[in-house]
């Protein structure tokens, strides 16, 4: 079993070198694949002897055990990449994962906010306090750019150009993109940089654009707590919330106002257009709701 676990680490090292995956993604692969190895060894199998039927049985047991389809899909993705790696490295003469059936995933629409709800959320921070001025600038940038929360908290001073009104983002797979900020976000960034950030740093030298109260890089979890705090103040239902709620609103509202789908794809940093297309369903659903509410024959 130790040898199989060592092969997982070799695979993760290769992934990190080739694809520059985030640590969270690598940790998820490690957990899933370690579980696969333990499951196989419990049945007298190894990575070298496992067959497609074994892996399909494992997936079936997960479904019967009440695991969500998304969890099974993630596990299947990990197994496919791993066994493809073992095949390329000539540790195996075949790839048993190639025969596995994919679980059917329910299409879930992203949680979105109306433009009025977003406006209330953006107005929630008290801008006369440095900490909340930082949060105000972060919310404005998030809605103006559609960044992922991890991208937002990772921004540095050198990533923004207020003169040009753009932000440079290093997204998934280490892909770089330039995203316009818009006048409102630029204004609040300028205000924050003059009246908020110096107070937060308190003499500490750090390149992070949005430091925490301890003059360190803020975590995604911390910012998520801040969003929930302001949502309560704005009277927004918690069911409407997710860490990426403003990213979803950014995409949906752009499409509602006639933006081209491929432009939205580029701004969001999606490598696959199908990932962006789900926002068209959100926009369509919003139109359907409005029709039902206001049309006399709906």
UniProtKB/Swiss-Prot annotation:
Family: Belongs to the 'phage' integrase family. XerD subfamily.
Protein name, as recorded: Tyrosine recombinase XerD
Compartments it resides in: Cytoplasm
One GO BP: DNA recombination
GO cellular component: cytoplasm; Holliday junction resolvase complex
Domain Core-binding (CB): residue ranges: 2-87
Residues of the Tyr recombinase domain: 108-292
Function statement: Site-specific tyrosine recombinase, which acts by catalyzing the cutting and rejoining of the recombining DNA molecules. Binds cooperatively to specific DNA consensus sequences that are separated from XerC binding sites by a short central region, forming the heterotetrameric XerC-XerD complex that recombines DNA substrates. The complex is essential to convert dimers of the bacterial chromosome into monomers to permit their segregation at cell division. It also contributes to the segregational stability of plasmids. In the complex XerD specifically exchanges the bottom DNA strands.
């Amino acid at each position: 079993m130790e040898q199989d676990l060592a092969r997982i680490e070799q695979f993760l090292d290769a992934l990190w070198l080739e694809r520059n995956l985030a640590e969270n993604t690598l940790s998820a692969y490690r957990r899933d694949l370690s579980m696969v190895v333990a499951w196989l060894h419990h049945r007298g199998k190894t990575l070298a002897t496992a067959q497609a039927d074994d892996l399909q049985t494992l997936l079936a047991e997960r479904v019967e055990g009440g695991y969500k389809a998304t969890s099974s899909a993630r596990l299947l993705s990990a197994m496919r990449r791993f066994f493809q790696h073992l095949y390329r490295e000539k540790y195996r003469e075949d790839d048993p994962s190639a025969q596995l059936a994919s679980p059917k995933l329910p299409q879930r629409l992203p949680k979105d906010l109306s433009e009025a709800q977003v406006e209330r959320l953006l107005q929630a921070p008290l801008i006369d306090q440095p900490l909340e001025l930082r949060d105000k600038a972060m919310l404005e940038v998030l809605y103006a750019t559609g960044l992922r929360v991890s991208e937002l908290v990772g921004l540095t001073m050198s990533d923004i150009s207020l003169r040009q009104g753009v932000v440079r983002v290093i997204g998934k797979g280490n892909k770089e993109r330039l995203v316009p900020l818009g006048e409102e976000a630029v204004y609040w960034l300028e205000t924050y940089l003059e009246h908020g950030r110096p107070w937060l740093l308190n003499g500490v030298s750090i390149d992070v654009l949005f430091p925490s109260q301890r003059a360190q890089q803020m975590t995604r979890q911390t910012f998520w707590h801040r969003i929930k705090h302001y949502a309560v103040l704005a009277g927004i239902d918690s069911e409407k919330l997710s860490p990426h709620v403003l990213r979803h609103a950014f995409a949906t509202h752009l499409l509602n106002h006639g933006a081209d789908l491929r432009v939205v794809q580029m701004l969001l940093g999606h490598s696959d257009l199908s990932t962006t297309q789900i926002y068209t369903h959100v926009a369509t659903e919003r139109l359907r709701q409005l029709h039902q509410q206001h049309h006399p024959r709906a």
